[in-house]
Amino acid sequence: MSIKKKFSSLPADQDAAIAEVEAILRHKRWQMPFKRGLDIVASAFGLLILTPVFLGVALAIKLDDGGPVFYRQLRVGRNGKPFSILKFRTMVQNADRAGLPLTVGADPRVTKVGQLLRRTKLDELAQLMNVLRGEMSLVGPRPEVLRYVDMYDPLQRMALRLRPGVTDPASIRYRDETRCWVPPPIRSGLISIR
């Protein structure tokens, strides 16, 4: 089912929509411990079998510019709790201080290795560590930076009731946001609830 169809079924009245989402969450409450168990097993297994890939990516980043392997950024997690998301670094050091908050087009801050990591989404693999620590889930609403969460309306805030995910339906649909910028997929978190 398309994202548009999913949202077309939401009531126009935000209070009714919030009540519907709360009912869905209550109904799925028993599933959450099983989902967490699956996250632990899958992320631990993924980290184990992907160790050679992690080492290769780390070596490539070090050989490219000698900087740190990981990039950490503060994101908003479940129940609004901030956490430090991990990614393999794809930009020059201190890039967040030297440009736009979004990467667009041929951003000169992206390293050569970083271009490959972004194109293949290998930079996201480090988030398996966030999943294992319980800060994220494999599937859920994408974790946003605080400045976007501050703009959420009450319905959008419902997504914060879930553990953020490494992937979600919007991440698949808007896979390459650097070519075609769309507003942050704020409402995508609600799709994860459904």
Where in the sequence are the language-model features?
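A short, structured surface patch at a secondary-structure boundary
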Residues: 104-169
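Short, hydrophobic secondary-structure boundary micro-motifs
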Residues: 57, 100, 139-141, 146-147, ...
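Short, glycine-rich, amphipathic interfacial segments at transmembrane boundaries or analogous
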Residues: 4-15, 71-109, 170-194
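A hydrophobic, helix-centered structural microdomain
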Residues: 3-7, 22-95, 130
